[in-house]
From Swiss-Prot:
The modification O-(pantetheine 4'-phosphoryl)serine is found at residue 36. 4'-phosphopantetheine is transferred from CoA to a specific serine of apo-DCP. InterPro entries: ACP-like_sf (IPR036736), DltC (IPR003230), PP-bd_ACP (IPR009081). It is found in: Cytoplasm. One of its GO terms (cellular component) is cytoplasm. It comes from Enterococcus faecalis (strain ATCC 700802 / V583). Carrier protein involved in the D-alanylation of lipoteichoic acid (LTA). The loading of thioester-linked D-alanine onto DltC is catalyzed by D-alanine--D-alanyl carrier protein ligase DltA. The DltC-carried D-alanyl group is further transferred to cell membrane phosphatidylglycerol (PG) by forming an ester bond, probably catalyzed by DltD. D-alanylation of LTA plays an important role in modulating the properties of the cell wall in Gram-positive bacteria, influencing the net charge of the cell wall. Residues 1-78 form the Carrier domain. PROSITE patterns: CARRIER. GO terms for molecular function: D-alanyl carrier activity. It comes from the Bacteria. SUPFAM superfamilies: ACP-like. The gene is dltC. This is D-alanyl carrier protein.
Amino acid sequence: MNIQETVLNILEDITGTDEVVNNQDIQLFEEGLLDSLATVQLLVEIEGQLGIQVPVSDFDREVWGTPKQIIQQVEALQ
């Protein structure tokens, strides 16, 4: 499984909707699909499944706001 598939699977599990797969430009925070607790869960899952550590201090909702942006950020950190 590649980074994109893994991140989308993680997001689908955390948000409980496949909308994150079908619309990768959806604003996760504005739509109420992610909150601060879900964000921590997302970062833990990314580290656990991909071995990529994302410091919480580097997490900015403006840059990590959509599934597409999250995939780009994770790929940049690998």
